[in-house]
Each structure stands twice: as structure tokens, then as C-alpha cells.
């Protein structure tokens, strides 16, 4: 078997008869595997099994090395086009002072202007766990300060010892 899984080339194809298609789209019809292999050899190309489950199996005459190179190139292009969303985390406590809130809001605004998502986390310590609503209230206060330049992606919710809220840059 060839290096890639489920791709059969040339002599690896076990079917006695195949439906053969040329690299340029020429349909050779249903012919024996040997005849298809001869045509491929005369052209200096490979016989590649495309649809093994079809009756009869479909083979294509092509330059397999070139085909594989183009597939890898397409995958690299697709990977480049994918945008990685960076999430910045800002941790707060319930007893944070107003000037500290302002400082953290300033950082959040910078992150949002850079197009990054921001996750605000309020850590609940000790007895604060008994009343997680104070964390939600805290994040609602934060939301009032950032709502002019952010959209709320996730409302404040308790997750373990944290109350989390996710905001994204405002669109448009």
C-alpha cells in the first residue's frame, strides 16, 4: 500500500475491471485493469483508484506526485486563512478597588481594539462561594463599563470557583 492511507496506485489496484478516466477528463469506459495500466504507462502517469466502492471501481490516470503536492498546497493555504482567535483573561476579585477596576478595564479596551476576545473572571474565595451572585453583580458592573466598545458573547455564569463573562470586539 502507498504512503497515504486508502490510496491505491498502479499494481496495488486489485479489481479486474475498472472505469477509467484520463487526467484531461477523457472517459475510457469500463476496461481491464491491465489495459488501464498500459494507457497510464504510455502517458508516463499513475493509475489512481478514486472510488473503490463503485461498481466497477473508478480509476483516474494522473500524475500522483503532482496531485499530492497540490492537495498539500491547498491545505496550507486553508490553514493560513484560518483566523486564530486569541482570548485574553482578566482576573478580578469581589473586593477589588475602583481604581484597579479602571486599570483592568483600560487593558481590556486595548485587547478589544486589537481584535482579541476578553474573558473576565471573578474568583470566589472562602465564604464568597455561598453567594455567587456577588460575582455576577461584579461582572454586570464591568459590563456597564465595557459595553460601549464590546459585545457580550457569554453572560456571567458560575463555573467552579469562578464567575466568567466573555466579551468580543464590537462589530462595525
From Swiss-Prot:
Q: Which family does it belong to?
A: Belongs to the IF-3 family.
Q: Which GO terms describe its biological process?
A: ribosome disassembly
Q: Which PROSITE patterns match?
A: IF3
Which cell locations does it reside in? Cytoplasm
Name any one GO molecular function: ribosome binding
What's the superkingdom here? Answer: Bacteria
Sorted UniProt keywords: Cytoplasm, Initiation factor, Protein biosynthesis
| Gene Ontology cellular component terms for the protein in this record | cytosol; membrane
What does the UniProt function comment say about this protein?
Answer: IF-3 binds to the 30S ribosomal subunit and shifts the equilibrium between 70S ribosomes and their 50S and 30S subunits in favor of the free subunits, thus enhancing the availability of 30S subunits on which protein synthesis initiation begins.
The record ties this protein, via HAMAP family, to:
IF_3 (MF_00080)
Protein name, UniProt field: Translation initiation factor IF-3
Is NADP given among the entry's keywords?
Answer: no
At the highest ranks, the source species' classification is: Bacteria, Pseudomonadati, Campylobacterota, Epsilonproteobacteria, Campylobacterales
Amino acid at each position: 500500500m502507498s504512503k497515504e492511507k486508502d490510496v491505491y496506485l498502479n499494481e496495488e489496484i486489485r479489481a479486474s475491471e475498472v472505469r477509467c478516466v484520463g487526467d484531461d477528463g477523457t472517459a475510457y469506459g469500463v476496461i481491464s485493469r491491465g489495459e488501464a495500466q498500459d494507457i497510464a504507462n504510455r502517458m508516463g502517469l499513475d493509475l489512481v483508484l478514486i472510488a473503490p466502492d463503485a461498481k466497477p471501481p473508478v480509476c483516474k490516470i494522473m500524475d500522483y506526485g503532482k496531485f499530492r503536492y497540490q492537495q498539500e498546497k491547498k491545505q496550507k493555504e486553508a490553514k493560513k486563512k484560518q483566523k486564530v482567535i486569541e482570548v485574553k483573561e482578566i482576573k478580578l476579585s469581589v473586593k477589588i478597588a475602583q481604581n484597579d477596576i479602571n486599570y483592568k478595564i483600560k487593558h481590556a479596551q486595548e485587547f478589544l481594539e486589537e481584535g482579541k476576545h476578553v474573558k473576565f473572571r471573578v474568583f470566589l474565595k472562602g465564604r464568597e462561594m455561598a453567594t455567587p451572585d456577588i460575582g455576577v453583580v461584579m461582572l454586570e458592573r464591568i459590563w456597564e463599563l465595557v459595553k460601549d466598545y464590546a459585545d457580550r458573547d457569554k453572560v456571567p455564569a458560575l463555573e467552579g470557583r469562578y464567575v466568567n463573562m466573555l466579551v468580543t470586539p464590537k462589530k462595525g
